[in-house]
Amino acid sequence: MAAPKGNRFWEARSSHGRNPKFESPEALWAACCEYFEWVEANPLWEMKAFSYQGEVTQEPIAKMRAMTITGLTLFLDVTLETWRQYRVREDLSEVVTRAEQIIYDQKFSGAADDLLNANIIARDLGLKEQSQFEDVTPDKGDRDKRRSRIKELFNRGTGRDS
């Protein structure tokens, strides 16, 4: 059944849109801390085979779970776009920055200690080894003069001309 024409039921609502997920920086920080604690309490498990006196057994080994922004947003039940908007909100930007720094540090430290795959983490963190090559050869005119002089000296040393 359609609403009657000219109705204004929507004006009866006290606010428009859904209520914010986190109404204060403290609420967002508490939720972020819950995620950090969850990551620590829920490691990934790998089955490793061990051999002792000819008997092979498999044992579960706890492995560090990397914190991620995507994991955090899923835990908080917000989208990545919402997280980006929190980053620019004056009241929440400090919490977002701090959470991102904690995630960065956990990944970097885990990779440095070989608890996480260093190649994957380096790519994720935007780290790369830089090799910079610079052509320090002077302009072509000087290079031609130098080559000519080297050739002249070489030929003089070997007793040949041209």
From Swiss-Prot:
Entry keywords, A to Z: DNA-binding, Late protein, Viral genome packaging, Viral release from host cell
Record region (Disordered): 132-162
Signal peptide segment: none
Regions annotated as coiled coil: none
Compositionally biased residues, Basic and acidic residues: 137-162
Matches recorded under InterPro entries: GP3_package (IPR032066)
Alphabetized GO MF terms: DNA binding
Keyword Thylakoid appears in the UniProt entry: no
Region (Helix-turn-helix (HTH)): 7-27
Pfam families: GP3_package
Domain of life: Viruses
Primary role: The terminase small subunit binds to the packaging initiation site and regulates the ATPase activity of the terminase large subunit. The terminase lies at a unique vertex of the procapsid and is composed of two subunits, a small terminase subunit involved in viral DNA recognition (packaging 'pac' sequence), and a large terminase subunit possessing endonucleolytic and ATPase activities. Both terminase subunits heterooligomerize and are docked on the portal protein to form the packaging machine.
Family in the record: Belongs to the P22likevirus small terminase family.
Subunit structure: Homononamer; forms a ring-like structure through which genomic DNA is translocated into the capsid. Heterodimer with the terminase small subunit gp3; the active complex is probably heterooligomeric. Interacts with the terminase small subunit; the active complex is composed of dimer of terminase large subunits and a nonamer ring of terminase small subunits.
Protein name: Terminase, small subunit
Organism listed in the record: Enterobacteria phage LP7 (Bacteriophage LP7)
Lineage: Viruses, Duplodnaviria, Heunggongvirae, Uroviricota, Caudoviricetes
